[in-house]
Amino acid sequence: MTETTTAPTHKMTTKDYVYQVSAGVSNAILVCLGIGLLLQSFATMLHWSALYQVGTIAQVLLGPAFGVAIATMLHSNTLVTFSAMISSTVGANAVFFSQSSTNGVTATGHTLAQAAQSSIFTTGQPISAVAAGLVAVLVGNYLTGKTPLDMMLVPLAATFVGAVTGLGLAAVTTPALVWLSQFIAASMKVNPLLGSMAVSLAWALFLMTPASSAALAVAVMLDPVSSGAALIGTTAQFVGFTVMSYRQNNLGANIAQGIITPKVQFPNLLVNPRLAIPPMVAAVVCAPIATIVFNFSTTYKLAGLGLNSLIAPLTLASTNLGRFGVFMLVGVVLPAVISLVLYRVLLAANWVESQQLQLEIV
């Protein structure tokens, strides 16, 4: 059976492309990294090694998932989708090739000798992965339906152009991201107070904009201490906006902003940016307390997630109860108190109004 679906005929604006691609990338990270980590947390609690490896498999599929996400959000057919999957995997710089033979074992215990040059998948980095996947989709969608040779021409052109783009970008972006990660780590050592405050505030801002805080944390491969600061900063937004507006919204809306994403408050912040002050202040205050006083740190895979789907707290609870306790105290309780107090101050000063955080279905 051949693929007959064509690319959409309506013209998309740059804003549409940014929104659609960002949404797809965020969902890819949520499923591959977030659910992958969640499965590993369950596996650790259940002492089930095979399930833990399933979580690992989910995480290393992040590169190809970017391509599928972009193609899906831009309404591509399957020929273009698979081309984007290949291109984004190349762009992620996620596949290594062994220099000698080795024995491999699957999650089910099947063993097989792997010859030299066997591929080894890793998570990779999202910058050039997303770019390569997007290029493949744009090329594929443009060519779809223009010739009688779609079955051959579309995937060949999309894969070739996307993969070459991925190779070129990965050669530049991977070293650059490694350098940026080292720079952030060094700045944290030079001035842990200002460093943790800056990282926490930056990732809190990323979370509340259309950008993906989780993708950016993965992109720069934050060091453990910076990741801890970023996690506190993003968690403060989940907690802060929920406690400030829980009386203004119904249960569903509070669940949406409390454990899915506070990004739903973005339209309200455009109306009155001062609403963001309490959670942002909480992020700046709590991050150095966590990282300096309690030596809180975590992996970059959790850094930008906040309370999304409760992945971070469940992962911390299953791996280190001490860090989980610090996270709950400094990342949840303290930001809630700070945000609520400052919100009442803003109300008293008439800087904000009582119903400006109400979420509406549009």
Each predicted region: which residue ranges?
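Pore-lining transmembrane helices
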Residues: 2-362
